[in-house]
Amino acid sequence: MALWMRLLPLLALLALWAPAPTRAFVNQHLCGSHLVEALYLVCGERGFFYTPKARREVEDLQVRDVELAGAPGEGGLQPLALEGALQKRGIVEQCCTSICSLYQLENYCN
């Protein structure tokens, strides 16, 4: 019997045991639980840095924006004019609003 006939069952068995091809990580939008899962995948046992804003902090920012706007006709500073200067670029802005890479995710690992 030919050699290839004897190797055919072995090759078929190896083909069945081979891991399925996985899609490589491409730059993509990651939000919510998908972002957290990606951080767990990238950071592994090191863990990652995450400090969510408390509800009070968010409310304080909203009040500050209203105070900056002033009453109609007063010519107060518009919050949109200061938004770029006051806003930090966090992981949500990098990965959910914009497209994120593995290297950017690694910046948030411990």
From Swiss-Prot:
Positions annotated as propeptide: 57-87
Chief place of localization: secreted
GO molecular function: hormone activity; identical protein binding; insulin receptor binding; insulin-like growth factor receptor binding; protease binding
GO biological process: acute-phase response; alpha-beta T cell activation; fatty acid homeostasis; G protein-coupled receptor signaling pathway; glucose homeostasis; glucose metabolic process; insulin receptor signaling pathway; negative regulation of acute inflammatory response
Signal peptide: 1-24
InterPro entries attached to this UniProt entry: Insulin, Insulin-like, Insulin-like_sf, Insulin_CS, Insulin_family
Localisation per UniProt entry: Secreted
Disulfide bond sites: 31-96, 43-109, 95-100
One term under GO cellular component: extracellular space
Keyword line: Carbohydrate metabolism, Cleavage on pair of basic residues, Disulfide bond, Glucose metabolism, Hormone, Secreted, Signal
Complexes and interactors: Heterodimer of a B chain and an A chain linked by two disulfide bonds.
Role, per record: Insulin decreases blood glucose concentration. It increases cell permeability to monosaccharides, amino acids and fatty acids. It accelerates glycolysis, the pentose phosphate cycle, and glycogen synthesis in liver.
Family the entry assigns: Belongs to the insulin family.
Protein name: Insulin
Organism: Canis lupus familiaris
Protein's gene: INS
